[in-house]
From Swiss-Prot:
Belongs to the phenylacetyl-CoA ligase family. Keywords: Ligase, Nucleotide-binding. Monomer. This is Phenylacetate-coenzyme A ligase. InterPro entries: Adenylate-forming_Reductase (IPR051414), AMP-bd_C_sf (IPR045851), AMP-dep_Lig_C (IPR028154), AMP-dep_synth/lig_dom (IPR000873), ANL_N_sf (IPR042099), PA_CoA_lig_proteobact_actino (IPR049623), PA_CoA_ligase (IPR011880).
Length: 439
């Protein structure tokens, strides 16, 4: 059911108000174009399609996409840097790349049309979150090869907002500018927003004296408990933006302010599937699995059935006719196997945030003790709970240990530390320190 206000209807793109049938017809036409574009211009796709016995002309309905092969991050690395580009080099106006923590980075390219599409979907995302022309947007995503900063920047400008291009880091200065410039919206990772919230409190600033009303958070998974914590501490609406560089960057999906029930996928540009991460079988909507995207409008770097490794489910549309992404429970490649139990860091986070005496900061340390895994969870007391005596602290430790055992099924050693002890992030947070191989 569409829940936008009639007064805002004129602001929406036509596909945001289209019928589901019209959307599916648009997707079919764009899929045919995208598959042919990839097949005609990228040798890897031509080879893979042939190996599967598939040809772009075989796509007669959306379900036929399952006949085509998957693409993964390793394909981009194996064809580094430009082997998967589908246009001549002179048509590529922008290059971005992943951080490349292991091996070669993944390189993504954009034509001018791609840049325009990207700006449009991010502008649509900010508007869906409640942003409007004339709002001031404080961008704390990193600028540079990372797509977050520039993606947010050009989308905000396309919407007609005033952009404050702060980038990451310099936390004290960030807060100074938030106080002085009075932005309406902040775009940042949720973990760094916690860092900024701590600094706002440290400087004695009342959040009600700030003009911030919206936080658009992405680039890492976060829980509903963390959302509530941020909203309560800062008095803002916290919304989830989803994206990945290989598909476009931020702006692939965006939570809508009307419903705040998970990011709406901009399905006129990105076609989603959910698959079994082991077998590759396409799963029905509503079932948990790995999210896969096929680009529908990208020129420089078309992506066919790209495996994101994000574990989620597809849900019916609410604020828009497009489907939504359920809360991402983790990644198929960051799942921890601890004494035979599959564990995702976000599951630990959920339990930490249920305990009112604890801050949002946590670390998971994994060791090998003989033939067994040993798990330590390091957490912090909130600043206002520093006065707790030893007995009270033991109760907090016991409560967290019990909850993790009950809800996740593993035994842990909980280490309770003073407020401000754990490392703060200026970008994507690192919560897991796996030292089992070194043990």
């Amino acid at each position: 059911m569409n829940m936008y206000h009639d007064a805002d209807r004129a602001l929406l793109d036509p596909m945001e108000t289209a019928s589901v049938d019209a959307l599916r017809q648009h997707q079919l036409e764009r899929l045919r174009w995208s598959l042919k574009h990839a097949y005609d211009n990228v040798p890897l796709y031509r080879q893979r399609f042939a190996e599967c016995g598939a040809h772009p002309d075989d796509l007669t309905c959306l379900e036929d996409l399952a006949k085509f092969p998957f693409t993964g991050k390793n394909d981009l690395r194996d064809n580094y840097p430009y082997g998967m580009f589908a246009v001549p080099q002179e048509e590529v106006v922008r290059l971005h790349a992943s951080s490349g923590t292991t091996g070669k980075p993944t390189v993504v390219g954009y034509t001018q049309n791609d840049i325009n599409t990207w700006a449009n979907v991010v502008a649509r995302s900010i508007r869906a979150a409640g942003g409007r022309k004339g709002d001031k947007v404080h961008v704390s995503y990193g600028y540079g090869l990372f797509t977050g900063g520039l993606g947010a920047h050009y989308g905000a400008e396309r919407l007609g907002c005033t952009v404050i291009p702060m980038s990451g880091g310099q936390t004290e200065k960030q807060v100074q500018l938030i106080r002085d410039f009075q932005p309406d919206i902040i775009m940042v990772t949720p973990s760094y927003m916690l860092n900024l919230a701590d600094e706002i409190e440290r400087q004695g600033i009342d959040p009600h004296d700030l003009k911030l009303r919206l936080g658009i958070f992405g680039a890492e998974p976060w829980t509903d408990e963390l959302r509530r914590s941020i909203e309560q501490r800062l008095g803002i609406n916290a919304l989830d933006i989803y994206g990945l560089s290989e598909i476009m960057g931020p702006g692939v999906a965006m939570e809508c302010i009307e419903t705040k029930d998970g990011p709406t996928i901009w399905e006129d540009h990105f076609y989603p599937e959910i698959i079994d991460p082991v077998t590759g079988e396409v799963l029905p909507d509503g079932q948990l699995g790995e999210l896969v995207f096929t680009s529908l409008s990208k020129e420089a770097l078309p992506m066919v059935r790209y495996r994101t490794r994000d574990l989620t489910r597809l849900l019916p549309g609410t604020a828009r006719p497009m489907r939504r992404i359920g809360k991402i429970t983790g990644r198929s490649d960051d799942m921890l196997i601890i004494r035979g139990v599959n564990v995702f860091p976000t599951q630990i986070e959920e339990q930490v945030l249920k305990i009112k005496q604890l801050s949002e900061m946590y670390e998971i340390h994994l060791y090998r003790n003989g033939n067994l895994d040993s798990v330590e969870v390091h957490v912090e007391l909130r600043a206002e709970c520093q006065h707790l005596d030893e007995g009270q602290r033991k109760l907090v430790i016991g409560e967290l240990s019990k909850q993790i055992k009950t809800y996740i099924g593993i035994s842990t050693q909980v280490h309770l530390q003073a407020c401000g002890t754990l490392k703060r992030s200026e970008g994507k947070a690192c919560h897991v320190y796996d030292k089992r191989l070194a043990s």
